[in-house]
A protein has these predicted regions:
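Extracellular S/T/G-rich loop segment that most often corresponds to the catalytic His/Ser-adjacent loop
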Residues: 170, 306-394
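Inhibitory N-terminal propeptides of secreted protease zymogens
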Residues: 2-128
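Short helix-loop-beta-strand segments that form the rim/entrance of peptidase-like active sites
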Residues: 220-241, 245, 398-411
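Glycine-centered tight turns that cap/initiate beta-strands
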Residues: 115, 290, 313-316
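C-terminal subdomain of the subtilisin-like protease fold in secreted/lumenal serine endopeptidases
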Residues: 254, 258-265, 276-277, 394-432
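Substrate-binding/access-modulating region of protease and related hydrolase catalytic domains
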Residues: 235-311, 324, 368-383, 419-420
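Active-site core segment of subtilase-fold serine proteases
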Residues: 137-227, 248-256, 260-262, 353-358, ...
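Protease zymogen maturation seam
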Residues: 83-165, 178-179, 365-367, 420-422, ...
Length: 432
């Protein structure tokens, strides 16, 4: 059973320790009031990461959970201490625990009396998981590419994606990226991906995860140059966000007629159970005919399910290696992964400045960037599939669900033994 411990670092790879410490410090140093972030571990190492002092509860069990925890009923709690109870989405509430009780203790007692899945931690979600913990963005830190480098895979020569709206939940769009890179022209920024002030000597630092959303949008646009893409900064705290906050934001987007929700998320959960707030959001999404959700499988190199990709209603994308014929060493895999697409050494738009590596074995290494980068991960195989779906929609008149099913059928028809269903950019020659 996973449990929180101050010794969670014991036996955990330095790579994973660096990633978690980065997130913990970022939450602690954020300007708004944020809960303390902790790691739970199991026999293999870190199991999941979550917010201490608050839990998510299914609404139909709320009064029973309050009774188990020795709390007053929902009405009294709302009347006396309303700040301790917040609606996340219909069917799920966020409960702030009494000061003396930990999340681990509270959930152990709730599960003992009501079983698993009634209440869960408020999990920390990050941009497309790695490191054996379902955390942190791509499979590698970004590598420099010259500014005049062309995208790889290349920009298709047609106008695919016209009339298709894609909501990209990521780290936002870098200021000026849509002007600096022709294939990003017209991409909308719901939120920007801000760079910090320059350091003395004119050095522009690039923080961890900055530029991730711009790179993903660039890959997507190479597949569907005419698609309407709205990039939002959902992961402003070191590439991470709490499940409760993210789902509240996503619920508001359901009213805007989005065709494809592209979520750059891959996270592990307590007992590998579904994220209950996301579960309710997906139910709401599927009430809208034709809309779909797509997410990366994550970069832990194992078959353990990551969320939200493991939900039946989500199209989940793994990564192919550089030969486009084998499974990338870092990609997650298994029956819950729907399709694989190229995800190693892609080249696309990025920030200009100095990036200092924060993950072993390159910790402290400074890398200079000029607006383009080479990057690997399921974060970047996923927008290839999203772009192919959008391009098919504009070509055939199908809605997103119909286009996705047709492409998944195509992927299954060309499945590679030992890998699985595969989709490749239709305009790009397979590497030798």
């Amino acid at each position: 059973m996973p449990e929180e411990t101050e010794n969670w670092r014991d036996g955990v790879s330095q790579h994973a320790v660096d990633e978690i410490d980065c997130i913990i410090k970022a939450f602690r140093g954020s300007s708004d009031r944020r809960p303390e972030i902790k790691a739970a571990r199991n026999q293999r190492g870190v199991d999941h990461v979550y917010a201490e002092g608050q839990i998510l509860v299914r609404a139909e069990y709320l009064d029973r959970v309050l009774e188990i925890l020795g709390e007053q009923g929902e009405r009294d709690l709302q009347a006396n201490t309303p700040e301790r109870l917040r609606r996340v989405i219909g069917g799920v509430a966020l409960l702030t625990l009494a000061d003396s009780r930990t999340v681990s203790d509270a959930l152990d007692e709730i599960e003992r009396q009501l079983g698993r899945g009634v209440a869960t931690p408020d999990h920390v979600l990050t941009v497309a998981g790695r490191g054996g913990i379902g955390l942190a963005c791509p499979a590698t830190e970004p590598q420099p590419a010259y500014f005049d480098a062309e995208p790889y895979p290349a920009v298709t020569g047609d106008h695919g994606g016209a009339g298709v709206m894609i909501y990209l939940a990521d780290t936002g769009l870098l200021d000026g990226a849509d002007e600096a890179h022709r294939w990003l022209a017209g991409v909308q920024a719901d939120d920007m991906d801000p760079l910090p002030p320059m350091l003395p000597g004119g050095v522009q630092p690039i923080p961890p995860y900055t530029g991730h959303g711009t790179f993903v949008a660039g890959v997507m646009r190479c597949m569907a140059p005419a698609a309407e893409i709205v990039v939002t900064n959902c992961f402003s705290v070191a590439g991470s966000q709490l499940e409760s906050d993210l789902v509240t934001k996503l619920e508001d987007e359901l009213k805007h007629g989005v065709d494809i929700f592209h979520l750059s998320i891959a996270a592990r959960s307590r007992h590998d159970l579904p994220l209950i707030a996301f579960e309710q959001w997906l139910k709401r999404l599927h009430q809208t005919k034709g809309s779909i959700c797509i997410a990366p499988a994550g970069n832990d190199g194992h078959r353990r399910p990551n969320w939200p990709g493991a939900f039946p209603g989500v199209i989940t994308v793994g990564a192919l290696g550089g030969d486009w014929h084998s499974r990338a060493s870092f990609t997650n895999f298994g029956g819950w992964v729907d399709v694989y697409a190229p995800g190693r050494d892609l080249i696309n738009a990025y920030a200009a400045g100095t990036y200092t590596c924060h993950v072993a074995p390159y910790t402290g290494q400074a890398r200079e960037f000029y607006g383009m980068a080479k990057w690997s991960g399921t974060s970047f195989s996923t927008p290839i599939v999203t772009g192919l779906i959008a391009a098919r929609m504009s070509r055939t008149g199908e809605n997103a669900a119909q286009a996705a099913e047709a492409l998944l059928a195509e992927a299954r028809s060309q499945a590679i033994p030992g890998v699985g269903p595969v989709l490749l950019p239709h305009h790009q020659v397979r590497p030798d």
